[in-house]
Amino acid sequence: MKNIFTLTFILCSFLAFAQKKEKVKGSKIVKMEQKEVENFQNLEVEDNLEIFLVKGNECAIEIEADDNLIEYVESKSAGNTLKLSTSRDITSSKKLSVRVTYTDDFKMLIAKNETNITALSDITLDNITFKTYDYAKLFLNAKTKMFTLMANDKSKVELNLKSEKTTIDLSKSAQLKALISSTSMKFDLYQKSKGDIEGDIIDLDLTLDNNASLDGEKLVAKNAEIKAEGYSTAKIMVATKVIINASGKSEIQLYGEPKIELKRFTESAVLTKKPSK
């Protein structure tokens, strides 16, 4: 039995070592290199790459990095998905970025680890989804018919959006700062996520739970349905009608002069009516 435990420990240690990337530092001499890629609809980015998005007629990538690091920037195609990552643990560099050209077929971007994603121009697509994890950062302007954002872990997103239909889901400790104009928006915040939102929404479906917080004092919704639970907090302005479901120790600060319907109001929930500024 002791031999089995010893063998298991050695095997686990070997696997952990095998999965650990070799560390490398950049030369500080920057070089650019273009790489051919297959057409893609989805983009997955990992590690600590800086990504710049630009729209074009054909899919392409251009790497700008320290000359000894370019070979470690990997691009792999799997079906309709392009995956970008590094094969080494790059501890320092003068430049480590990839300019990604997407087309009208672009559907989804997934960002993980410490990636930094910036759209160099407005993303104008019918339907696009962004998913962020770990410590990823996302900066973009978008004009779409349907827009979906799912931010998780400690990722941060800054967004300027015009969309007909918007779906946003924040969880864990994700943060969103945004200016949004949308016909309809479903907005869910969970755990310790935070939203700082301005803009105009016609129909808003808002859900908050756990310790989530929303600062929407400058977000004007014509109609809203709000569900607040746990220790969540929300500041929001509603113009015409609001339906409220509040429980736990949730707190809602309501601005504007809407018709208020208390559908459910239990436990230690607090609703405070605030004057419009």
For each predicted feature, which ranges?
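Intrinsically disordered, low-complexity terminal regions
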Residues: 1-277
